[in-house]
Design a protein with these regions (language model features):
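Aromatic-lined carbohydrate-recognition surfaces of secreted/lumenal glycan-active proteins
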Residues: 131-145
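Glycine-rich tight-turn/loop motif centered on a GG-T
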Residues: 58-59, 106-112
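An N-terminally biased module of ancient metal coordination in phosphate/nucleic-acid-related enzymes
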Residues: 1-91, 192, 200-203, 234
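Catalytic beta/alpha-barrel core
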Residues: 109-116, 168
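Charged catalytic cores and adjacent phosphate/nucleic-acid-binding surfaces used
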Residues: 1-17, 21-29, 93-107, 124-125, ...
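Helix C-cap/helix->beta junction micro-motif
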Residues: 79, 129, 188-189
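Conserved beta-strand positions in the central sheet of alpha/beta enzyme cores
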Residues: 40-41, 134-135, 166
Length: 240
């Protein structure tokens, strides 16, 4: 029987993501204990983060951005679990987020301020470096006090530019409309369905992920397997 590879494609670290509440080292330990074979570190890549770093050069900013990923990778080298590079990308046009992986560190240095580019230009750039693009939590809602209700702030604006989207998102701090998610899967059958924990806090551990057959390294192999829809199972909590 071919080995199964249990992978969470949506993990944040406190070193890089301001909303992250778990260090990269601890995240690796927790996922190893939970029986995962690998995680993709997808810290937030957006204008607000890079502006917060002040007047550093772009290369220095990327070194800061990669701290969570690099720390996690060093920790994973002590055991058997694998850590891969990804980003959760957002540009200045909207609040939509996208999981992007399949490129290596060099792309982040060579292509500055991708958040300032149009979605079309940024996605074309990602693909030039072999990356896959999956929309994160496309139908998420947040509570707005002035309206006294939950309002959707994330939408699938560019389905024709996507490889797939998060059908399951394990982070229950937010509301995602399952009816809209299912409707999108039916409307766009060519899009690959994935699952991610959206890990920020220990309570999010192992609430999402995918299972592939085989053993994967480097990240380009994972991107190719997902692109070819070789996912065997979507991991999700009973609450999803």
């Amino acid at each position: 029987m071919e080995k199964q590879f249990k992978l969470d494609i949506h993990v944040h670290t406190s070193e890089t993501s301001s909303c992250g509440q778990v260090s990269a080292q601890e995240a690796v330990r927790l996922y190893e204990q939970a029986g995962y074979d690998g995680i993709i570190i997808t810290d937030h890549y957006h204008r607000e983060y890079f502006n917060s770093l002040g007047n550093l050069t772009w290369n220095d900013k990327i070194d800061c951005y990669l701290k969570g990923y690099r720390t996690a990778k060093s920790e994973a080298a002590k055991g058997k679990m694998k850590v891969f590079l990804g980003i959760e990308y957002r540009n200045v046009e909207s609040d939509n987020d996208y999981l992007v992986f399949g490129m290596d560190e060099s792309m982040l240095f060579k292509e500055p301020e991708l958040y300032s580019r149009s979605i079309q230009d940024a996605f074309a750039c990602f693909r030039q470096y072999g990356a896959i693009i999956l929309q994160a939590h496309p139908f998420r809602k947040r509570f707005e006090k002035d309206k006294g209700d939950f309002v959707r702030y994330s939408s699938m604006d560019y389905p024709e530019l996507l490889d797939g989207f998060e059908f399951y998102n394990g982070n229950k701090n937010w509301i995602q409309d399952p009816a809209e998610t299912k409707a999108a899967a039916e409307k766009y059958p060519n899009l690959i369905l994935v699952s991610g924990s959206d890990f920020h806090h220990p309570s999010h551990l192992a609430t999402g992920g995918i299972i592939l057959n085989g053993n994967f390294d480097p990240i380009q192999e994972i991107a190719e397997a997902v692109r070819n829809n070789e996912i065997r199972e979507l991991i999700h909590s009973d609450e999803n």
